[in-house]
Amino acid sequence: MQSYGGSLNYSPSFNNPKMEHGRNSYRRKGIDMGNIIGDPFALATTSIATLAWIIILFGSIFGYRDQDPDKNLIWPTYSWFTLVFNFFLILGIFFVIASDSAQTYHVAIVGYLAVGLVGSTSSINNLIYSGVASMEATAAGYILLSMVTIIWIFYFGSAPSAVPRAYIDSFALSKESALPAHHMSRQTMNHNGLSSPNAYGSYNMRPETSASGLQPPQMYTGQLNGLENPARQSQIPQGFSSNNIPKPPQGTEGEIVPPTEYPYRAKAIFSYEANPDDANEISFSKHEVLEISDVSGRWWQARKETGETGIAPSNYLILL
């Protein structure tokens, strides 16, 4: 039986070396202590959580020793699991923040934090009314850890563009180049039509905005091996050609006509340097206020106070 699968000529973009370079740019990054030390929120919360865990550890050791079954003072065995679970939870959050991969694992982090919060609150309920100093100290450690856990759930469960999280991140020294610390990699991938990662760690396709990025569509051809239908050629009226089709008015390729209205205002939460290969992008500094014409999509048409117009990445801006 004759095969109908002829040889196909695929677009060269499938084997584009620039795409391979872009993929390598987004591989797992190493640990950078500057992400912890330079971020007051991360430094404070991880330090308090570690201190609370140490209190829980020593309180559990002495509390287990001081239990008295005759007085109905029994140490809850599940508290040991909660102790170990929170140890790995704090350690995991430390590495996630240090490697600047919170946007990749934020969903898993929130789930694990919820489990840890349930264990901590259950331990508090069983230890705080015991009347034994060591058990009450353990309960105090769990209370402190639960407070940090609730703050973490709110932080990691919020989008980077949320007002409270953007305000917290504005104090970080490294977040300006790190939130989208993929800024340098994003510029590399701009040539391939890939935008910055969104809040869920995925990448969105965006059209090329520069004239150099306008290329004719790739044609995918194949051998039909007798399946073609030549009758369709005879159905085309004689004298009909593409010249009879009205053509749209010619314009400058790659040129974006700026809108006349800018009803929105947005504040830059991070500085952004425009791609020098894309004339439609604009640069702006941190805390600069821009006028926005449309808030749909990943790239917004913006106008600066100087009158300069262009497109700006939405994850660097927050609406006012």
Swiss-Prot record:
Residues 1-40, 99-103, 158-320 are cytoplasmic. It is a multi-pass membrane protein. Residues 62-77, 125-136 are extracellular. The chain crosses the membrane at residues 41-61, 78-98, 104-124, 137-157. The keyword Translocase does not apply. Its main location: membrane. CDD domains: SH3_Sho1p. It is found in: Cell membrane. Keywords: Cell membrane, Membrane, SH3 domain, Stress response, Transmembrane, Transmembrane helix. Residues 261-320 form the SH3 domain. Residues 187-245 have a biased composition (Polar residues). Residues 187-258 are annotated as: Disordered. GO terms for cellular component: plasma membrane. PROSITE patterns: SH3 (PS50002). Plasma membrane osmosensor that activates the high osmolarity glycerol (HOG) MAPK signaling pathway in response to high osmolarity. Belongs to the SHO1 family. Forms homooligomers. This is High osmolarity signaling protein SHO1. It comes from Sordaria macrospora (strain ATCC MYA-333 / DSM 997 / K(L3346) / K-hell). The gene is SHO1.
